[in-house]
Amino acid sequence: MNFAVLPPEVNSARIFAGAGLGPMLAAASAWDGLAEELHAAAGSFASVTTGLAGDAWHGPASLAMTRAASPYVGWLNTAAGQAAQAAGQARLAASAFEATLAATVSPAMVAANRTRLASLVAANLLGQNAPAIAAAEAEYEQIWAQDVAAMFGYHSAASAVATQLAPIQEGLQQQLQNVLAQLASGNLGSGNVGVGNIGNDNIGNANIGFGNRGDANIGIGNIGDRNLGIGNTGNWNIGIGITGNGQIGFGKPANPDVLVVGNGGPGVTALVMGGTDSLLPLPNIPLLEYAARFITPVHPGYTATFLETPSQFFPFTGLNSLTYDVSVAQGVTNLHTAIMAQLAAGNEVVVFGTSQSATIATFEMRYLQSLPAHLRPGLDELSFTLTGNPNRPDGGILTRFGFSIPQLGFTLSGATPADAYPTVDYAFQYDGVNDFPKYPLNVFATANAIAGILFLHSGLIALPPDLASGVVQPVSSPDVLTTYILLPSQDLPLLVPLRAIPLLGNPLADLIQPDLRVLVELGYDRTAHQDVPSPFGLFPDVDWAEVAADLQQGAVQGVNDALSGLGLPPPWQPALPRLF
């Protein structure tokens, strides 16, 4: 289990509301009792057999009995020693739990933080509580990190205890029974399931080799029936990596998962993850090429490889798909394993995350931050590139709204750390996942952001990113490790359905877009520090005289754009209104 994706409400509750030390200490006592009984049984058995052989019973039969009894005495003594070891391990587990209990934040403190945050948000009518809200969120992230560190420490200690515990040895007759069972089934080797297999780990009948699944396969890792070779899927194939039936030769690789950019590094690997599965998911190579547009400005040479994550969100990706929390948790596990493997190989790592995988990157950053300095990668070894980040501190939909939906397995995940590792966070203007309005009571801005989720974030309208027009947004300190870039959108997503109307759709959209953009932008604060988590507010501070001037200018611009779209000369040439 990856505890980094679980909020402190869950981790703290599990520790404080669980069974506690009692069962572990009871188990230790029970193992001690078993060890004493086994030692006593061994001593009694040895005493009886020795007494018989030394007093009344002599000759070949007595000698045979003594030799037969000796292994049983040894087995009893060994089992007694293992029971005593199990008792000691149970006490170590109890000690690990006791230390974890002391290091975990109490549920009462977690609840107090959430209650204080809710009160501050409810009373934040004019934004006066923004600093206190940010402080409460920062405290909550510290609580989260402390709980994660405690749980991972407990998991490591418990795993070490379990690893050190030797398995209780089998009875003296068990090995003979295993051999007889293998012979009865006609299998030769280990791990075979079925009849007549020769080799290891075959499942089926009459397979020869290793890891085959099916019947009458010869080779390694074949799936199906009567295949000859390695890694074939189907029936009656001869060769390597074939998919199908009755084929001979070599299978064509499916979708390559590697893209070399520039000189390939060397020694620089980009781990590229996709977003939540959609109706039109990108194949691996197009996804790698898409990611390269964002990674290359900072890293001109690297080797990009696709990293598989579940990318599911029940029920939107299917009724049999994983919940968002479980999907993210598995993704974090995959990402952390891949990062550690690349670092162990001596490579610098760049992580690319978009949409759900940006949340995965967020949890990985938090987990690495919770580790001691000597156990986590250095700032020169690991960096991140994010797009469509729902956890963006200012604008991410999961940061704007502090909500969870337990029925769907969807838990609030908070803001992406701004000071964990060098990061470039790209946001697409008006994509509601990463650029949701700060003032959602502005119905124009909110409706436009929802349309942005539908048309921009989903990929239904594929717009190539114009990185040259990106605007670097302000941060609170030059020491912040994250660079935030906003990529402007020339058209409002809200007008996409109108533009789909033949002939008059585009001119009508051009007519109203400049003024509508002015109204939409009232829902945003483009001067806010992007590294500071910013929940929603109610009413912006507006200079209505400036708004009136922008609307007047937008009306003129709208007429010009509409006439231009119809092929008519515009009557005025005003300056373009501000995009943001």
UniProtKB/Swiss-Prot annotation:
UniProt function note: Elicits a high humoral and a low T-cell response. Could be involved in directing the host toward development of a more humoral type of immune response.
Organism (species): Mycobacterium tuberculosis (strain ATCC 25618 / H37Rv)
Disulfide bond entries: none
InterPro entries in the cross-refs: AB_hydrolase_fold, PE-PPE_C, PPE_dom, PPE_sf
PANTHER family reported for this sequence: GLUTAMINE-RICH PROTEIN 2 (PTHR46766:SF1)
Protein name, per record: Uncharacterized PPE family protein PPE42
Coiled-coil annotated spans: none
Protein family membership: Belongs to the mycobacterial PPE family.
Top-level taxon: Bacteria
GO BP terms, alphabetized: response to host immune response; symbiont-mediated perturbation of host innate immune response
UniProt domain PE-PPE: residue ranges: 300-525
